[in-house]
Each structure stands twice: as C-alpha cells, then as structure tokens.
C-alpha cells in the first residue's frame, strides 16, 4: 500500500483546502446566478421547457 514518506506542510495543506473551497464557491455562485436568470426569464445560455406535466 502506498504511504507518503513525509508530512504535507501546513501551507500546502491550506492552499489545497482553499482551492477546493474556491471551486465550490464558484459553482454555487454560477448555479445561483443561473437560477436567478431563470426566475426572471432572461436566460439565453440554454434551452429548457417551461411547461411541467402535472400527473
């Protein structure tokens, strides 16, 4: 089984964690922006169906 030989430094660990959090923040902002534009009816980036079949 592969085992790292030395500990990862705090700065490297913090940098990786910050990058991971930044990616999540960007994805959340993008989805929120898309949802807002859908509610306002100003979407131009994709096609979606307005009508929902109620059963």
Swiss-Prot record:
Biological process (GO), any one: translation
Compartments where located: Plastid, Chloroplast
Disordered as annotated region, ranges: 1-24
UniProt keyword terms in alphabetical order: Chloroplast, Plastid, Ribonucleoprotein, Ribosomal protein
Main location: plastid
UniProt GO molecular function: structural constituent of ribosome
GO cellular component: chloroplast; large ribosomal subunit
Pfam family, one: Ribosomal_L32p
Cross-referenced InterPro entries: Ribosomal_bL32 (IPR002677), Ribosomal_bL32_plant/cyanobact (IPR044958), Ribosomal_zn-bd (IPR011332)
Similarity remark: Belongs to the bacterial ribosomal protein bL32 family.
HAMAP family membership: Ribosomal_bL32
Protein name: Large ribosomal subunit protein bL32c
Organism from which the protein derives: Phaeodactylum tricornutum (strain CCAP 1055/1)
């Amino acid at each position: 089984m592969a085992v790292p030989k030395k500990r990862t430094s705090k700065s490297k660990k913090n940098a990786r964690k910050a990058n991971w959090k930044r990616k999540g923040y960007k994805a959340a902002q993008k989805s929120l922006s898309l949802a807002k534009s859908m509610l306002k009816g100003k979407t131009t980036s994709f096609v979606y169906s307005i009508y929902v079949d109620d059963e």
